[in-house]
A protein has these predicted regions:
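N-terminal capping/linker segments that flank leucine-rich repeat
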Residues: 2-89, 94, 99-100, 105-109, ...
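Consensus positions within tandem repeat domains that build extended binding/scaffold surfaces
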Residues: 111, 133-136, 155-158
Length: 173
């Protein structure tokens, strides 16, 4: 009877271990879909600068500056998690849609020069903006910028703008 008990114990122990393995947490997924953006942002996340662990929301909440230029970035999803962002430089990429930053109210400096941007409406509510570089894009309409009352520097050369009158409402330029 004692021998039988010992024989059963290892088997039941092995079953318990199998159950434990099934309950393991799923591996964290990066908040970024665009690998070039993730690699660029990684340089600004001190704890993960030299490893390949996925960047998760907790890594990004205190980031104030991101600069990733000429990296072939297309998709900005994930940047919406960077709530403390004050300076964003993504010049020289392949960006056409930058809706991901539309709620980042602390941004003061934004460089999106040399991209494929046509619609600037995502920045209409970013009232802390003081500097915008949008040269060498495909921007046509400046109306979304007219309420950015803190704007001090606005660069728009080499775009498709017909009407500059919304920029005239920016009194600090």
């Amino acid at each position: 009877s004692l021998i039988v008990g010992l024989t059963l114990s290892p088997a039941s122990f092995a079953e318990e271990k199998k159950e434990e393995k099934k309950k393991e947490e799923p591996k964290p997924q990066s908040v970024f879909k665009d690998k070039a953006l993730e690699e660029g942002v990684r340089k600004f996340v001190f704890a993960k600068r030299y490893n390949k662990e996925p960047l998760v929301e907790a890594d990004l909440i205190h980031l104030s500056t991101i600069k990733v230029t000429n990296a072939g970035i297309k998709d900005l999803s994930g940047l919406e998690k960077c709530r403390a962002l004050a300076s964003l430089d993504l010049a020289g990429n392949e960006i056409s849609d930058f809706n991901a930053i539309k709620d980042l109210k602390r941004i003061q400096y934004l460089n999106l020069a040399k991209n494929k941007i046509e619609d600037v409406s995502p920045i209409a509510g970013l009232t802390a903006l003081q500097y915008i570089e949008l040269s060498n894009n495909r921007v046509k309409d400046l109306k979304p910028l007219e309420k950015l009352s803190n704007m001090r520097s606005l660069y728009l050369s080499n775009n498709r703008i017909i009407d500059f009158s919304p920029a005239l409402k920016l009194t600090k330029l």
